[in-house]
Amino acid sequence: MRLIPLKTAQQVSKWAAKHIVDRINTFAPTAERPFVLGLPTGGTPLQTYKELIKLYQAEEVSFKYVVTFNMDEYVGLPKEHPESYHSFMYNNFFNHIDIQPQNINILDGNTDDHDEECRRYEEKIKSYGKINLFMGGVGVDGHIAFNEPASSLASRTRIKTLTEDTLIANSRFFDNDVTKVPKYALTIGVATLLDAEEVMLLVTGHNKALALQAGVEGNVNHFWTISALQLHRHAIFVCDEPATQELKVKTVKYFTELEQRAIHSVLD
């Protein structure tokens, strides 16, 4: 496990974007051998997408041979709805880079057969071998994608009922009206995430501090989905200072010294 303790959320976004670009460029993708990138939605990764767009515009990276898989999508929300994850991804990222439309994969929450859609999604991921890098965020309760507390750590892509806490948290995108938030979503599973070659979680803000503590210092258990990343060979937590408030001082000190070069790469 790696923990990259930075000062601000802006530094987290810059570090994450640079890491993604470095991974893509080192991989040197082609049409026959694309780089497979897993992506989240939500407020935390928004600035990272802006940084990636800047790097693309500066001609430091191309997404022409990048294949993407998104983590989740609401059930029953039309794709053209401004708060659908289809709309989010196109408005905030895909419309601004050179990714090929056929390389974009987002779960269809409006299909008549949700189980078949989830099975198809898993098979599509497998057809590429693996996801090379999966970027994600984390909820205040430690959930990743829509794998809420008590989700099976062996779970695969499936339909999930959203918790009351998640409905309340997401109501800020729906005029602060909980009744407008879809009650169900299609989501990748915890095991789907763990199958990725590398997982990078962005953790920012004091309200995520308990989740980060559970992920780094806590025991692996299904009430804290984030803790499953302790089982992953290449997991990276990129966090700002407020998110480290619940970690032991010696934990932060250890990773600050260990990742000194990585930290300074975004500060220089």
Swiss-Prot record:
The record marks 151, 158, 160-161, 254 as: Part of the allosteric site. Its EC number is 3.5.99.6. Pathway: Amino-sugar metabolism; N-acetylneuraminate degradation; D-fructose 6-phosphate from N-acetylneuraminate: step 5/5. One of its GO terms (cellular component) is cytoplasm. CDD domains: GlcN6P_deaminase. It catalyses: alpha-D-glucosamine 6-phosphate + H2O = beta-D-fructose 6-phosphate + NH4(+). Homohexamer. PANTHER family: GLUCOSAMINE-6-PHOSPHATE ISOMERASE (PTHR11280:SF5). NCBIfam families: nagB. This is Glucosamine-6-phosphate deaminase. It comes from Histophilus somni (strain 129Pt) (Haemophilus somnus).
